[in-house]
């Protein structure tokens, strides 16, 4: 039986390597402000085999505040897992807000669905079980200029981030935000070589090094790379 991703992720789980400081941030600022259904979902997800894919609570609060500051109403999420960031988004949107959520594995989403239902925000979510690229291509054909999206959050297959970007920069309105998760990849992107990584992690690491260089040079967006969680790059569409 092959090793799970947790077997080779846990050592380099996050950017912040001071466990004491991380604990302080979570216990002082994040957990006290965490919605009760998010807390329940986090605790269930932490017991899951792929728990390393969980968006941390402090990052969730960051996403929530950004959505509210933007007055976002129409959003896209690529990569859902158990739905922590999805529930975060749904809670932050107004009552008539809408999320198009895309993931290849509905069974993971169903782990989080009871918490989404208890939070009373299921009506905001359109979950699509599919690879993301064909769905995005269909959305490009069907979405009118006046119906462009305010915000997109990407936390899916890392080697496709650049492909997602080419679609999202057309689907998200001018002034809207596209966020890419994990762009610092446990800090390993800082090094031309990083021996000892699992082959899948090395592919992701190289993909992120290329993506980071590409986004920094893309004139269609302005960017800010934030060292929260495992690194989040915010792109604001300029044209």
Curated annotation (Swiss-Prot):
UniProt GO MF annotations: metal ion binding; O-methyltransferase activity; S-adenosylmethionine-dependent methyltransferase activity
Cofactor: Mg(2+)
Keyword Transferase: yes
Residues the entry annotates as binding a divalent metal cation: 155, 181-182
Gene3D superfamilies, per database record: Vaccinia Virus protein VP39
EC number annotated for this UniProt entry: 2.1.1.336
PROSITE patterns assigned: SAM_OMT_I (PS51682)
Keywords linked to the UniProt accession: Alkaloid metabolism, Metal-binding, Methyltransferase, S-adenosyl-L-methionine, Transferase
Pfam families noted in UniProt: Methyltransf_3
One of the GO biological process terms: methylation
Domain of life according to the entry: Eukaryota
Metabolic or biological pathway, per its Swiss-Prot or TrEMBL entry: Alkaloid biosynthesis
PANTHER family named among the record's database cross-references: O-METHYLTRANSFERASE-RELATED, TAPETUM-SPECIFIC METHYLTRANSFERASE 1
Reported function: 4'-O-methyltransferase converting norbelladine to 4'-O-methylnorbelladine. 4'-O-methylnorbelladine is a precursor to all Amaryllidaceae alkaloids such as galanthamine, lycorine and haemanthamine, and including haemanthamine- and crinamine-type alkaloids, promising anticancer agents.
Family indicated by similarity: Belongs to the class I-like SAM-binding methyltransferase superfamily. Cation-dependent O-methyltransferase family.
Protein's recorded name: Norbelladine 4'-O-methyltransferase 5
Source lineage: Eukaryota, Viridiplantae, Streptophyta, Embryophyta, Tracheophyta
